[in-house]
């Protein structure tokens, strides 16, 4: 029993759990369990009453709802580190911002360079710009204490800025219409959160109440609802009026739910991709090459190059006691686009099978390449 407890509480166990549920999902989707798996996550669940109802399939409740809690945790951790921790210095926090810019611009340019002659294919230019923060964090968890905290923070920070960029891209290029009323309600909720923070109110129930309304409004607005989690995190006070730690306590309470329940469930719901109808030959189509080269090469080169230039221009600084070799390994992991890339792919091509699933296969190949190469590289390089 003591051994099991030690294993569960180890730093690597959440990563192992995430990888296990990823492969379990792939197994279910590509076996006789495929129909049961699909029906389970596509089953509709309705919450509300009369005219105030939200009806969504289980996988969307997970992707739009539970993952917002994950983003809340990431936002809280980032806020704490910026105000009290290792990112207090403006040059330290600017590093992941430059990295995120490079990690979006370079893959997009690679995809465009390969697919510029094909109008429909060009709709997917944003597919390789995304980083799946959940899976990238999962790989880091597998590495345990081999990765310094400063590098973990860099990846978390970069992934948040990257996902904020993805949300902006989705809102500008892949949203059919935005609801003005829902956006106004979002602004009212943000104002309410601002007041709660200004008066240093630390009743968690009030933040939950306003947060739920904000999430619903965000859901109805056309903007990705996970942004609500990041917004809420900005307004959670660092301390109580008596100067006792508050934000850190909230984070400590949420963290076990995220790493042991939300992330494994997210992996199980999203990693189920049917690869039986995919042809390996399609990997060499322009769309596939654009995605694979964009995610696997474009991401790591873009993040590293932009960060390197920013450091040399003294606009940012490398974390203390970190060498460029180890830093590059983290850059490789940013190429894990997986579920975020699949999400943008669905928006771009409207879930069309015109490419015979070559686009989805390319996302899988690039993401697994980034994960495996990044993991091995970080294991070897000191």
UniProtKB/Swiss-Prot annotation:
GO terms for molecular function: sodium:proton antiporter activity. It holds the Pfam family Na_H_antiport_1. InterPro entries: Na/H_antiporter_dom_sf, NhaA. One of its GO terms (cellular component) is plasma membrane. GO terms for biological process: regulation of pH. The chain crosses the membrane at residues 7-27, 58-78, 94-114, 124-144, 153-173, 178-198, 199-219, 255-275, 291-311, 327-347, 361-381. It is a multi-pass membrane protein. It is found in: Cell inner membrane. Keywords: Antiport, Cell inner membrane, Cell membrane, Ion transport, Membrane, Sodium, Sodium transport, Transmembrane, Transmembrane helix, Transport. It catalyses: Na(+)(in) + 2 H(+)(out) = Na(+)(out) + 2 H(+)(in). Belongs to the NhaA Na(+)/H(+) (TC 2.A.33) antiporter family. HAMAP family: NhaA (MF_01844). NCBIfam families: NhaA, PRK09560.1, PRK09561.1. Na(+)/H(+) antiporter that extrudes sodium in exchange for external protons. This is Na(+)/H(+) antiporter NhaA 2.
């Amino acid at each position: 029993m003591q051994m099991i407890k030690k294993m569960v509480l180890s730093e690597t166990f959440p990563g192992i759990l995430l990888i296990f549920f990823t492969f379990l999902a792939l197994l279910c989707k590509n076996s006789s369990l495929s129909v049961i798996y699909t029906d389970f996550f596509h089953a509709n669940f309705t919450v509300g009453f009369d005219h105030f109802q939200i009806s969504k399939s289980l996988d969307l409740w997970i992707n739009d709802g539970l993952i917002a809690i994950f983003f809340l945790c990431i936002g809280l951790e980032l806020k704490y580190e910026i105000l009290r921790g290792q990112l207090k210095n403006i040059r330290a926090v600017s590093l992941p911002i430059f990295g995120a810019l490079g990690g979006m611009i370079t893959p997009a340019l690679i995809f465009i360079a390969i697919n510029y002659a094909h109008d429909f294919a060009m709709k997917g230019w944003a597919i390789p710009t995304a980083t799946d923060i959940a899976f990238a964090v999962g790989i880091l968890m597998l590495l345990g204490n081999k990765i310094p905290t400063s590098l973990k923070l860099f990846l978390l920070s970069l992934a948040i800025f990257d996902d904020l960029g993805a949300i902006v891209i989705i809102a500008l290029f892949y949203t059919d219409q935005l609801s003005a009323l829902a956006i106004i309600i979002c602004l009212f909720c943000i104002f309410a959160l601002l007041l709660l923070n200004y008066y240093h109110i630390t009743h968690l129930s009030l933040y939950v109440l306003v947060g739920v309304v904000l999430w619903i409004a965000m859901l109805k607005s056309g903007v990705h609802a996970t942004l609500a989690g990041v917004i809420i995190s900005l307004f959670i006070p660092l301390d109580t009026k008596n100067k006792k730690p508050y934000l850190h306590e909230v984070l400590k309470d949420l963290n076990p739910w995220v790493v042991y329940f939300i992330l494994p469930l997210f992996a199980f719901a999203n990693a189920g991709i049917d690869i039986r109808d995919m042809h390996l030959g399609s990997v060499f189509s322009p769309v596939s090459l654009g995605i694979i080269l964009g995610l696997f090469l474009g991401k790591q080169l873009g993040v590293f190059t932009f960060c390197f230039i920013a450091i040399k221009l003294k606009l940012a600084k490398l974390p203390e006691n970190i060498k460029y070799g180890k830093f590059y390994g983290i850059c490789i992991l940013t190429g894990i686009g997986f579920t975020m890339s699949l999400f943008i792919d669905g928006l771009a091509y409207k879930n069309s099978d015109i490419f015979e699933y070559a686009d989805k296969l390319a996302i899988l190949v690039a993401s697994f390449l980034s994960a495996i190469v990044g993991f091995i590289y970080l294991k070897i390089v000191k």
